[in-house]
Amino acid sequence: KKSSMYFKDLKKLENGLKTLQKDENIKSILLFGCDKNSANAAELEEVLRLNTKPLLGGIFPQIIADGELKEIGFLIIPLFEELEVSLFETQENISIETQLETQITSISREAKSIFCFVNAFWEEKTSFLEALYDELGPVVNYLGGGAGSLSFQSLPCVIANQNIYENAAVIGLTKSPILIS
């Protein structure tokens, strides 16, 4: 089985997501897209609604697929372990710290690794990352990055399950250590 799958457009991504839903071995999905894709957030969310597995990721200026730099398309990385996906976004009366304290459950405290994607232009990104580290500490493996566009305009770029968000971050926790080879 391939460790990643590239789709050049939204229709092909839709077909790929439908196929992944049938594979019981795939427990979670990482999804990365390019900001030059012709699909808007609403069109992407329509396709994401087909997914029933934990999913997280982001929109970036470029992705690497099949050893090539791509400025258009989507990349899926199927995972064989279930992730606990949590979204954090700007809310009027709830601080990021409070959101983290509420969402990081006792199960989360057993996490060995965390995927984290944050809008690079989100005003609260530094507060979020500091609070996340305060909550989970140095014993967790962190993997992720800042999503967004080289246009330096904030846009919906953080993907969590069936939706895409603008002023937000998403994490996926797993009890297994992430190994990069």
Predicted regions and their residues:
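Cofactor- and metal-binding active-site motifs of prokaryotic enzymes
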Residues: 1-181
